[in-house]
Amino acid sequence: MLVDELCRLYSIIKTILNYGLSDFVPTHRLIFPLRIGSRFLLRVLNKHSQLTLGERFRLALQELGPIWIKFGQMLSTRRDIFPDSVADQLSILQDRVAPFDGIIAKMCIERAIGNSLETWFKDFQEIPLASASISQVHSARLKKNNKDIVIKIIRPGLLPVIKIDICLMYRLAKWICKFLPEGRKFKFSEVVSEYEKTLFNELNLLKETANTIQLRRNFKKSQILYIPKVYVDFCSENVMVMERIYGIPVYNLVALKKQKTNMKLLAERGIEIFFTQVFRDSFFHGDMHPGNIFISYKHPGNPKYISVDCGIVGSLNKKDKYYLAANFIAFFNHDYRKIAELHLDSGWIPLDTNIEDFECAMRTVFEPIFEQPLEKIPFSKILLYLFNTARYFNMEIQPQLILLQKTLLYIEGIVRQLYPNLNLWKSAQPFLERWMRDQLKLSTTICALKDKIPHWIDKIPELPNLLSHEFKRSCMLQKKIEILIRELRTQRTNHGQALFLFGVGATLVTSSIFLYIQDKYLKIFSIFLFVIGIFIWTIGWKRIIQ
């Protein structure tokens, strides 16, 4: 571990102790030394015991900085991991940071375009229009045509900080999986990996440029959604130049009503945009929170959405789309057997799952929901209940479905705010049923076969070699499994001792920090204790990772 990582780890541990986040850890599942340490030391240092666990978690992430705030925002959609009380607190995290100097922004732009800013732009505003943890946005004009534009710039010096924090997130995820059996079920390393991928996509504005161009192409002739033009010649990894849009923020209901916007039609079009992106295009905007959506000033009776900030996008393959649509339709029809069969056929739950038990669990969860009027049943909650119930049957985490759930949560929140009486199910059902009918048409099947036939013909001469190769590979795999079983038996013997040493070392380190903070007369002893703890911890850690 590097010195920078150790310093940052100390800061993280201190924040965890200050906010009493040890409450997330079920102590009965810890090894003995860590159980003693958590009981007698961690809770003593909790300076915010009067707050709820969710509030403490939110404040801790805020204190750790913007990268952790964004991580918390992502975790807020993972209600399969956290209870609602915690997820609700995480959902109000605000990604707000002080802007960096406009002169520095100007220098970043000039470095990216390889020329002085005045060569291509005029009326550049040093005070940003918006500032966030990853980037900030400045307004200007293009010299050649006098068009209003915005210039998005990645915050300088961000990469080294992000790399350290991501590395520590991986370490924490690994420790959770080592010491908490429940942690393995949630695959925290995969959660961090998904966050890392999202974060680095946002750091590369060329990816956002490509996403924006694709979405603009998909809705080029649309009367319901407008995506602003990107000026590709000026775009790079750190700078993006695009058309400036003018519209009313979707959350400004007063302004929308003042210009006599057709709110019912606007809400219906929000649902239409979502399902069009998911089922027609298989390419959807994954960050459609209210801050990224505007309504055009033109034609309030025939309202049009404007969407920006396309750094995060998602896609579903044909199989996922089919099973998702079929699940919703089965839900409309109270067909829980069909829902169970779909989960099994899609591979979302293990093949050895008892289908009757799964069907019964679905009925138990959803039948009470149907006591409410259909228009009051939230789409996003149905998806959440569906995933949470399936989780108890060891459903694999599907990252693309998590992003879809987050997007649906945003869209549904916006739509219900615009027109509370809208029946989302009535709006969505015809769309889903039409899409399902289209998939079953003979013409659709013929088109799919025409696409695959050349590939099949090409592979026919290779079949004998492929079969021989697969037979050899299965024999090799059998031998590897036998070797692995022998190695696992050996490792199991040593693992308990390694965990004990690791736990003793961690407890001594925690105790030394506590003594160092609390008692000025025991500072030398606490340093001595810290060194011994690190030594024992290192021995245990090396044995664990071997």
UniProtKB/Swiss-Prot annotation:
Disulfide bonds: none
Domain Protein kinase: 123-501
Pfam families for this protein: ABC1 (PF03109)
Topological type in the membrane: Multi-pass membrane protein
Example of a GO cellular component annotation carried by this entry: plasma membrane
Known EC number: 2.7.-.-
Gene Ontology terms, MF aspect: ATP binding; protein kinase activity
Subcellular location: Cell inner membrane
Similarity annotation: Belongs to the ABC1 family. UbiB subfamily.
HAMAP family: UbiB (MF_00414)
PANTHER family per UniProt: CHAPERONE-ACTIVITY OF BC1 COMPLEX CABC1 -RELATED, PROTEIN ACTIVITY OF BC1 COMPLEX KINASE 7, CHLOROPLASTIC
NCBIfam families: PRK04750.1, UbiB
Name of the protein described by the UniProt record: Probable protein kinase UbiB
Organism of derivation: Blochmanniella pennsylvanica (strain BPEN)
Chain's gene name: ubiB
